[in-house]
Amino acid sequence: MVSTPEIKNQLARPDALGRFGKFGGKYVPETLMPALGELETAYQKYRDDASYQTELQNLLRDYVGRPSPLYFAERLTEYYARPDGTGAQIYLKREDLNHTGAHKINNALAQVLLAKRIGKQRVIAETGAGQHGVATATVCARFGLDCVIYMGIHDMERQALNVFRMKLMGAEVRPVEAGTGTLKDATSEAIRDWVTNVETTHYILGSVAGPHPYPMIVRDFHAIIGKETRVQCQEKWGGLPDILLACVGGGSNAIGLFHEFIDEPSIRLIGVEAAGEGVDTDKHAATLTLGRVGVLHGAMSYLLQDEDGQVIEAHSISAGLDYPGVGPEHSYLKDIRRAEYYSVTDKQALDGFQQLSRLEGIIPALETSHAIAYLETLCPQLNGSPRIVINCSGRGDKDVQTVAKVLNY
């Protein structure tokens, strides 16, 4: 664990250059620099603007349904209890209950309000699991903006429900066949579109990745998750959680939960990546576990690379974790040892998916299922009765067909 001054300093990051330590930055074509500058200026102007905040807070309450509940998972807690009844007390931060079924709406809504204020009529986004695409299509429908979503062809097949939802709300979904037809390729295509149409188009990047100011903006718009959690913990037991647990692909749901508590060194921050078919194979997405530092999609971070420094393809049963990079702030938190990152396999995630469904009647997204599955490793290591808050980042409706196919239901 790092010293308190180092942790305190973290809250001021990124620095003026958009860096978290050596990570982050702006590695983009010159044509995008004015747009990134415009976005940062607009964000700095409006984040403290009373009319912007009033509109955002009203919509988060009345349209999204915030605050999302902090739910005590009684039967999951009992499952991991010791014979004497002690053990971890497990709570779920229910982002799955938000409008559209995941945390992604927090960022999409706040960004579309920025896009309106800077005069952009066309919005583009990338999506993997489809939840960010659905959230973006949703807010564009709400505000009458043109919407184009880039999605890998492979992800469109395994997330067909979300493709239909996006189209139903008026979005154009453009299939991306390049590479493996997954999230990395969709992001690359979205950036190409933005370079071409930068004057008229706002790019709602869906995770805490990409060039500055996106990792900062997306984090800040998701920080409401942790802020609500702090208040709810105080209401429920008059204190703080002991452990925060979340899945990590790009890392937006995790940083949304973690950020409020980074300067609380007694709280463990644990991110869970996708080990796919195993970290000893070439089919995984365990970027923080096995990656090396490089540049992808405009930012320096840990990446999955080959010996020549070429980005290699990631694999996960979960479309939202199937990404060979990670947000730069997570790379920084790993390096200063403020957060811990582990990985679980597709098989373990499927077990977590079924476990939460059967014990709590809550069907989690396959992304969330990775965090649920890590309890199997974590709980036996713990002493006493620590309180664990898991970010239930999304619901599993979108994954039911995939899981049914794999498990032969």
UniProtKB/Swiss-Prot annotation:
SUPFAM superfamilies: Tryptophan synthase beta subunit-like PLP-dependent enzymes. CDD domains: Trp-synth_B. Coiled coil: none annotated. The modification N6-(pyridoxal phosphate)lysine is found at K104. Gene3D superfamilies: 3.40.50.1100. Its EC number is 4.2.1.20. Keywords: Amino-acid biosynthesis, Aromatic amino acid biosynthesis, Lyase, Pyridoxal phosphate, Tryptophan biosynthesis. GO terms for cellular component: cytoplasm. Pathway: Amino-acid biosynthesis; L-tryptophan biosynthesis; L-tryptophan from chorismate: step 5/5. InterPro entries: Trp_synth_b_CS, Trp_synth_beta, Trp_synth_beta/beta-like, TrpB-like_PALP, TrpB-like_PALP_sf. GO terms for molecular function: tryptophan synthase activity. It catalyses: (1S,2R)-1-C-(indol-3-yl)glycerol 3-phosphate + L-serine = D-glyceraldehyde 3-phosphate + L-tryptophan + H2O. Its cofactor is pyridoxal 5'-phosphate. It comes from the Bacteria. The beta subunit is responsible for the synthesis of L-tryptophan from indole and L-serine. NCBIfam families: trpB (TIGR00263). Tetramer of two alpha and two beta chains. Belongs to the TrpB family. HAMAP family: Trp_synth_beta (MF_00133). This is Tryptophan synthase beta chain 1. It comes from Nostoc sp. (strain PCC 7120 / SAG 25.82 / UTEX 2576).
